[in-house]
Amino acid sequence: MPIQPAFGNKDLNPQEVRKNQLISSRLSSIYERWGYEEVSPPKVERLETLTACGGISNKEIVKLVADDPIGLRPDMTASIARAASTRLAYKDRPLRLWTSGTIFKSKEDCDGKFVIEEGLQSGVELIGISDMAAEIELLYLLLDSMNQLEICSNQNPILLIGHQSILKLILSGISNDYKNKIQKYLTNYDLVETEDLDIDIEIKNKLLKVLKIRGNPSDVLDKLVNIYGSNTLFDELRRLFLIIEPISKKYGVSIQLDPTYQPHFKLYNGLIFQLICQTDYAPKVIARGGRYDDLVNSFTTSIENETGAGFSFSIDKIRELKLKVEYDDKKVARTLIAFSKSKRYEDALEKQLEIHRKGSMAMVELKPCDTKKEAEFLVNKRGFDKLVWIS
């Protein structure tokens, strides 16, 4: 029999499970304070939904054997967009929804074999707000959540922001024969391949300039204006950064604008962002999101355009951070109940029920102890806080 879990997955010990629960619980409390309501999308969906109109590769979906083409969700955004446009279509907008659950991704390893990765995700979706107010609320909520999780400047958090319309502007004027190739070079920050392009020298020089532009939002926007001229989008982004930069500085988060940033899943058609934290080994993306109007409209039967935006946290990656404080602010005292050979096991059970009725945690040592000293040794060995000795 195999003694290891499937490649790409791991067994979680009780401390890891508890930490996942506490992170998820804290996030859900934050979402609800902001007026978001919980929904629970299914783990199993039709492949047509899971691929999110081509935004998610078919290869990344774990497929199930059934009469209908179905699979396990690699992300929850498409499922919520579907529910918002169908079962929740009658509800007043804006819809503020949050969810938490397991996602499954199929991934090709270095040997060309497909493995399944399982993860825990928690996030929010804001449906029905078409202007930049939606992104501002979501970014404020993202930063507030990060602060409440006590992710501090020690993790060097960076909020990386891009916009699909900036990339479209950069690619405008380029023939369709080259567009996909150039987009790949830009999103991969490939200066060498870009320099070797056989295209108009003026366009190439603009592309090379853009590849070197990222960092402080105000500086990046100034440089983009110098290259492409004034643009309503640039004005809207200036307003957004003017609002969110004070709160980001307060929480120790650095904001970077990257004109060529593209997320892995191609779900988004507007603002896109991800929150990155530094670990001992490498940077980790702990949250990502953006606007996905096209996705939510693909599910609607209404003649009116629908809009949507949201983000999600990776609970597993947050758990792996070396946080400033542990999530034990509501730690319950652990009590061990031990009894001598002159007492009955039932006596210990009665005492356990009495402690439980007070809302506290208590466990019974199933075998009698010879002495109280032996019971005290078990308390220390097993990490209990106190002993109830019945003799």
Curated annotation (Swiss-Prot):
Superkingdom of source: Bacteria
Recorded metabolic or biological pathway in which this protein acts: Amino-acid biosynthesis; L-histidine biosynthesis; L-histidine from 5-phospho-alpha-D-ribose 1-diphosphate: step 1/9
Statement: the UniProt record of this protein carries the keyword Cytoplasm: yes
Task of the protein: Required for the first step of histidine biosynthesis. May allow the feedback regulation of ATP phosphoribosyltransferase activity by histidine.
Subunit details: Heteromultimer composed of HisG and HisZ subunits.
NCBIfam families given in the database record: hisZ_biosyn_reg (TIGR00443), PRK12292.2-1 (NF008939)
UniProt name for this protein: ATP phosphoribosyltransferase regulatory subunit
Organism per entry: Prochlorococcus marinus (strain SARG / CCMP1375 / SS120)
